[in-house]
From Swiss-Prot:
Keyword terms, alphabetized: Ribonucleoprotein, Ribosomal protein
Gene: rpmD
Database matches in Gene3D superfamilies: Ribosomal protein L30, ferredoxin-like fold domain (3.30.1390.20)
Native source organism of the sequence: Limosilactobacillus fermentum (strain NBRC 3956 / LMG 18251) (Lactobacillus fermentum)
Pfam families, A to Z: Ribosomal_L30 (PF00327)
PANTHER family on file: LARGE RIBOSOMAL SUBUNIT PROTEIN UL30M (PTHR15892:SF2), MITOCHONDRIAL RIBOSOMAL PROTEIN L30 (PTHR15892)
Subunit structure: Part of the 50S ribosomal subunit.
GO CC terms: cytosolic large ribosomal subunit
Protein name per the record: Large ribosomal subunit protein uL30
Top-rank taxon, per record: Bacteria
Amino acid sequence: MAKVKVTLIRSVTHRQPTQRRTVKALGLGKLHSSVILPDNAATRGAIFKVAHLVSIEEVK
């Protein structure tokens, strides 16, 4: 199964509460923190909601 590396590149300060919760649900905390997540529809949907705050890389 494919995986994606998600990195928080923009701060969640002054963002809507739903965006803050989405970032936390992805497992991201501080700036430049990264997590490797499975590439499925639920993960892609969460990433889409905060795409302007994170960077995405495909991991093999």
